[in-house]
Amino acid sequence: IEGVFVVVLAYLINLTMPPYIPEYSLAIGSGIILPLGFFYYVFAYFVICGGANATNITDGLDGMLSKLYMPVLLVLVVALYGATRIGFMDTVMFLPTVSGLYAVLGAAFGAVLGFLWFNAKPASIFMGDVGSLALGGFMGTVAMLLKSEIIMGVAAGMMVLILLSSFTQTMYFKITRKITGTGRRVFLRAPLHHHFEELGWSETKIVDRFFVLSILFSGLALVLLKFA
């Protein structure tokens, strides 16, 4: 069901593209277009479902998902501004049909900011899978609408690292168990934030430092957005 939904969504996203942008393509900075053909759907699956899983796994400590997610939204707003202004950024495709995303991104930012008020440590409410998966899928979908998937991946670098830590831990454990009979671990615990908890870091320190890193990743994404 998940795969069918992504295929339909990717097809609909492709329909929104202006006629001067090749169908089923990936933009790689400075107006470079890479046609993907059938692999566009595979790529869409990784972007949308990968984003959903990244935010879902990131939502493991009080306030962390909101603090890591908001900088990414701000990068997408800048990408949207560039996509709706001719000549503002040579690295962004001109997409006059996506200006309605301002309202959607603003609503998402406001919702996440409001949620943080109640989810800050000690949290009084929790998002759960429904909220975290939806935020990740939304992030990936907006990035695809803006042809800014790579920029989004860089901005969400901290969440990507958290996702990869969980994937690496699982795969390494399974492989070593199959080879040696005893599963081994790369991290003390996965995902990454639990590894640092095992090292004795406080929850507040982990969230704040990951937040700083998220800002740095988003800053790098803005640099790439302007000059790459």
Where do the language-model regions lie?
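"…together with the soluble PPM/PP2C metallo-phosphatase catalytic core" -> "…together
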Residues: 1-161
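Surface-exposed beta-strand edges and their flanking turn/coil or helix-capping segments
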Residues: 13-14, 79, 148-150, 167-169, ...
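Juxtamembrane boundary at the C-terminal end of a transmembrane helix
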Residues: 17-21, 220-228
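Membrane-proximal soluble regions of multi-pass membrane proteins
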Residues: 158-209
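Final/C-terminal transmembrane alpha-helix of multipass membrane proteins
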Residues: 205-225
